[in-house]
Amino acid sequence: MINSMAELGGGYFPLDILLNSLEEASAGTERDKGTRFETLIRDWLIKEPTYRDLFSEVLTYKDWSKQHPELVSSCRDIGIDLVGVNSDGNGYTAIQCKFYDKEATVPKSGVDSFLASSNKPFFTRRFLVATNENWTDNVKEEFQQQTPPVTLITRETLANSTVDWAAYQRGELKEVAKRTPRDYQKEAIKKVISGFESAD
């Protein structure tokens, strides 16, 4: 077991480490693992620049359904985990969070309940966020044929996020600091550029 980032040396993958820690903290309980992952995705959606401006808030389905009894008759989990309140005032985004093994392949039956329950006029967007990398062509095609289509957010998208996953594991929600060259690096860059210019 890895006790710190330092033990990994260079080339570690903070998202993988974070997901492993969520799994360990859940002690094999699928429900707890799912809830922890949903919290992570809610936090990510409100911080990640690509998505944060889309929503005025992101709620659990249970909390959202309690606020909107006129739209849904039950608060029970029907395949939708989170609901984004669209900041443009145009409805809601249905979000399903799937904490799968990295190598898992998901059949269409694995997403049918989400597709059915989110097929409502007040859901103007649909996101499926998953930690696996393998999706059959049939499932991807099904997502695109839906109205509205389903946006698939993969492990790769999460890993390449501007959210600092190592900081998140420590309880901080922030973006990765932008790197700027040090003085000696700036000097080396100038010399390289100068070398290119003199070669022309």
How would you describe each model-predicted region?
Residues 33-121:
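Catalytic centers of nucleases
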